[in-house]
Amino acid sequence: MVSFVQLVVQIREIFEHKMVDVDEVMKLMGSYKSDINEWRRFAIFDMNKYTRNLVDIGNGKYNLMILCWGPGMASSVHDHTDAHCFVKILDGELTETKYDWPKKKHTPLETIENKTYGLNGVSYMNDELGLHRMENQSHSNGAVSLHLYIPPYSTCNAFDERTGKKTKCTVTFYSKYGEKIDYHGSKEGK
């Protein structure tokens, strides 16, 4: 079993190499047993939206972040702009819905799979597997998840589930290294 700090260090060591070994990363993410005392300072919630809180930029090779989900909050259906996406549940439960890429304009997205991940569950996603949405289906409890994106990305595409329409989105952080970012007047935060 590894601590949160050891997990961050070992992820950095893995990505000193050029190739992403999905199985190795999944095993490492699975070896960490969530301890709120180790990651609490990075978990900053907002009552109106889910938050993306940066933990480590991995020398520009990846982003490691903690996402905080209030009751009933969900991401849009989105791609990963050719990045690998690993998710570890640190607290609560999240439901991942995977979709096929839109086949025609103005048609609903087709669901491939629905799966709920509980405490310490780990999932993997990339664009070859389709699109996905993460959702906290609880109406009373929050959820916290650790996300690893290789390579890091600053934009992605969101998809309308009813029509398949694609919209390019800028990806921002709510906090960096445990400190909330003040975007007042910043174009990045809008």
Swiss-Prot record:
Pathway(s) it belongs to: Organosulfur biosynthesis; taurine biosynthesis; hypotaurine from L-cysteine: step 1/2
Covalent cross-link 3'-(S-cysteinyl)-tyrosine (Cys-Tyr), where: C85-Y149
Record key words, sorted: Dioxygenase, Iron, Metal-binding, Oxidoreductase, Thioether bond
Listed GO MF terms: cysteine dioxygenase activity; ferrous iron binding
CC cofactor note: Binds 1 Fe cation per subunit.
Disulfide topology: none
EC numbers: 1.13.11.20
Reported modifications of this chain: The thioether cross-link between Cys-85 and Tyr-149 plays a structural role through stabilizing the Fe(2+) ion, and prevents the production of highly damaging free hydroxyl radicals by holding the oxygen radical via hydroxyl hydrogen.
SUPFAM superfamilies: RmlC-like cupins (SSF51182)
Domain of life: Eukaryota
GO biological process, one term: taurine biosynthetic process
Xref: Pfam families: CDO_I (PF05995)
Signal peptide residue numbers: none
Annotated Gene3D superfamilies: Jelly Rolls
Enzymatic reactions: L-cysteine + O2 = 3-sulfino-L-alanine + H(+)
Iron keyword on record: yes
Cofactor: Fe cation
Binding site for Fe cation: H78, H80, H132
InterPro entries: CDO_1, RmlC-like_jellyroll, RmlC_Cupin_sf
Family: Belongs to the cysteine dioxygenase family.
PANTHER family linked: CYSTEINE DIOXYGENASE, CYSTEINE DIOXYGENASE TYPE 1
Protein name, as recorded: Cysteine dioxygenase
Organism (species): Caenorhabditis briggsae
